[in-house]
Curated annotation (Swiss-Prot):
InterPro entries: Rv2632c-like, Rv2632c-like_sf
Cross-referenced Gene3D superfamilies: Rv1738
UniProt superkingdom: Bacteria
Gene Ontology CC entries for this record: cytosol; plasma membrane
UniProt induction comment: A member of the dormancy regulon. Induced in response to reduced oxygen tension (hypoxia), low levels of nitric oxide (NO) and carbon monoxide (CO). It is hoped that this regulon will give insight into the latent, or dormant phase of infection. Induced in C57BL/6 mouse lungs 3 weeks after low dose aerosol infection with H37Rv bacteria.
Family assignment from sequence similarity: To M.tuberculosis Rv2632c.
Protein known as: Uncharacterized protein Rv1738
Additional note from the record: Was identified as a high-confidence drug target.
Amino acid sequence: MCGDQSDHVLQHWTVDISIDEHEGLTRAKARLRWREKELVGVGLARLNPADRNVPEIGDELSVARALSDLGKRMLKVSTHDIEAVTHQPARLLY
């Protein structure tokens, strides 16, 4: 029966995000740990000298880029895992 609680599995994965800023460069790291593996995505944002300094925008942009990088890295892991199981080339789209 579809929706039966006996076939329902709930998992929680947590991404830890750290942000540091130095001399107009903001760097974010998005770290995911699961199944004894760890992936880290990195994102950078640089303050344009002509722009007003609004640190929150640099934080948002660097975090968005770090999460995007993490997603791409996760797809590479998934591709490798699929190929290991199927023994066929896999191509996953982002």
